[in-house]
Amino acid sequence: MSYPGYPPTGYPPFPGYPPAGQESSFPTAGQYPYPSGFPPMGGGAYPPAPSGGYPGAGGYPAPGGYPAPGGYPGALSPGGPPAYPGGQGFGAPPGGAGFSGYPQPPAQSYGGGPAQVPVPGGFPGGQMPSQYPGGQAPYPSQPASMTQGTQGTILPASNFDAMRDAEILRKAMKGFGTDEQAIVDVVSNRSNDQRQQIKAAFKTMYGKDLIKDLKSELSGNMEELILALFMPSTYYDAWSLRKAMQGAGTQERVLIEILCTRTNQEIRDIVRCYQLEFGRDLEKDIRSDTSGHFERLLVSMCQGNRDERQSVNHQMAQEDAQRLYQAGEGRLGTDESCFNMILATRSFPQLKATMEAYSRMANRDLLSSVSREFSGYVESGLKTILQCALNRPAFFAERLYYSMKGAGTDDSTLVRIVVTRSEIDLVQIKQMFTQMYQKTLSTMIASDTSGDYRKLLLAIVGQ
């Protein structure tokens, strides 16, 4: 696919970065704000960043910089809600049904709401059946060792000195050969904010662009991983979406992974960055690259208007469960708009309560019903939303597993998830990975990758 104003060849094919010695495929000075492809610290054509804005991304709005969406009071800040344990698999191709052994958490209370109203077809005492139709067992218990809340594997370095780090990187790339270990040691132990400061310090000290220097010294997967780490988080999501729709074909699973898992504020920031950086409307690009009910679901996700209150209305959960049953299993055909409306607007704690009510009412879990009623990428998108309501770390753990399972490695997915979750919930993702697959994430990465690329991934993930 070709777009006006872009270089004739568009973005290069995967891994998505230009070979050493070639001009960057990111916007040039005459096209977009960033001549090197990455935003300078507070520079470029973006408007001045407000106090407290994203570092190195002048023009990205500060957290909370957007007005609260109409009709959904109580939206949280960009950190988003905590993970909600207890999910189902995603990595298999669309069409698979069942739970694939995802763990169930201990009981959680989300507060508020009247007692649940008995529903015809429910179970005595509100108990779930010991087995679902087809012999599927309920989720096993979540291990007591599971770290509560969310935690990244990368934390801001104490006694941080951007100029000292810039000097280390300069020495690592100076002369014959490259000291990749020095690069690994620096970038894997600095937060994204600190990396933006290093990038700015490098240009101030040496009058050179750090990203261009890194491109000239690195190649392949190592280059892609390093460049991803130096992109501001919002920009990386926007860039990944652009790449997923650039050229022939569309990488639908990338669209699902980003748009169906981010918080309202993150989505709004992505939409704004996409417009500023690429001069394009994200919603229009999605409409031109997708169709049908999948298109409608992604357009709904682009609005960033999900209710983010943590309280649960149990009466609403019962009513939504009935509506979903009547829109799917309880009728001939499927009312897709009903599924879209509920899954696109309800908070994740509310959806979790709805799934529990649905299981009691229908003697079938909602994920299985979605598999029976939908197919293709709209099925994957709807299931991703439900999986995040149940267990967000488990969703990403399975995505990582399938990126390395079998012949070959989907390095793009591996890099994207490790980088984007490294400061959010990679600790919990690692714990779920071990429980689900009886091996550690680092063990699987070590057996599926090699060289400095492996060293850097393992340094980010940890043991």
Curated annotation (Swiss-Prot):
Chain positions with N6-acetyllysine modification: K208
Residues covered by region (Disordered): 1-34, 77-149
Region (3 X 5 AA tandem repeats of G-Y-P-P-X): 5-20
PROSITE patterns given in the database record: ANNEXIN_1, ANNEXIN_2
Biased composition regions of type Gly residues, renumbered to the chain: 86-99
Repeat positions for Annexin: 160-231, 232-303, 315-387, 391-462
Gene3D superfamilies, per database record: Annexin
UniProt-recorded Gene Ontology molecular function terms: calcium ion binding; calcium-dependent phospholipid binding; GTPase-dependent fusogenic activity
A GO cellular-component term linked to this record: collagen-containing extracellular matrix
Composition bias type Pro residues, residue spans: 1-18
One Pfam entry name: Annexin
Annotated stretches, region: Repeat-rich region: 1-143
Keywords recorded for this protein, A-Z: Acetylation, Annexin, Calcium, Calcium/phospholipid-binding, Repeat
Subunit record text: Interacts with PDCD6.
Family under the similarity heading: Belongs to the annexin family.
UniProt function note: Calcium/phospholipid-binding protein which promotes membrane fusion and is involved in exocytosis.
Protein name according to UniProt: Annexin A7
